[in-house]
Amino acid sequence: MSNSPIQAVIFDWAGTIVDFGSFAPTSIFVEAFKQGFDFEIDLEEAREPMGLGKWDHIQAVGRIPAVDKRWNEKFGRSMTSEDIDAIYAAFMPLQKAKVADHADPILNAIEVVNGLKDKGIKIGSCSGYPREVMDVLIPVAADYGYKPDYVVATDDLPQGGRPAPFMALKNVIELNVTDVNACIKVDDAAPGIDEGHNAGMWTVGLLLSGNEAGLTFEEYQAADEATLNAAREKARAKLLKSSPHYLIDTIADFPEVVADIERRLAAGERP
């Protein structure tokens, strides 16, 4: 029985609950471009469209003006769908081999999730990873203690992934949620925040644990306040374009947001 007006929280995976800094996908994108076409992209370029499904992500990287320029210089044309297919084909086995190495939960994530479960709040999740990558990640994350009630991968639904609301709404259906206004979507990337808005949910962006700050956990721990502030502001500038209801540093700060949304729902507010 729930003792909260919040029915469900839907979490992203990498950079939100596992894989501090969202390094599993970014490093693999760099490697996949190299392996598929002997073409160099840097980590910043690989991070730029994070949150999209991986095929769409590769397409978006190819459309970054600087990447498109270098691609044209090397191949005499812009990237085609066939090129994207080839890079995606290189990406998949690399990602499956590496994703388990980046399954460590982010600080306090398990405690926060278990606290939500104790309140009777359901835990949904969705990811920009395709199902065959999630099939590797889910059991490893479970060994660490992370067991969401439902998981949607970016290629599970024929309608597609983010920024459309379909993955979030699939969670709503499968978790038997009766009101999208009683749901919270938590993500470290803009497309996932947009997904939450499009699904009619409260949205929470993460500034320091995810893709936009791009810090390893070790860098985060060692950083002085000036370094953290610079990373925070870099992420804030990107995420504010999606107008999240809340911006917090990491999942460790989420319980205060939950308490505030509970108060607002009780007062009749809606997202």
Curated annotation (Swiss-Prot):
The active site is at D12 (nucleophile), K54 (schiff-base intermediate with substrate). It comes from the Bacteria. Keywords: Hydrolase, Magnesium, Metal-binding, Schiff base. It catalyses: phosphonoacetaldehyde + H2O = acetaldehyde + phosphate + H(+). Its EC number is 3.11.1.1. GO terms for molecular function: magnesium ion binding; phosphoglycolate phosphatase activity; phosphonoacetaldehyde hydrolase activity. Pfam families: Hydrolase. Coiled coil: none annotated. Transmembrane segments: none annotated. Mg(2+) binds at D12, A14, D188. Involved in phosphonate degradation. Homodimer. This is Phosphonoacetaldehyde hydrolase.
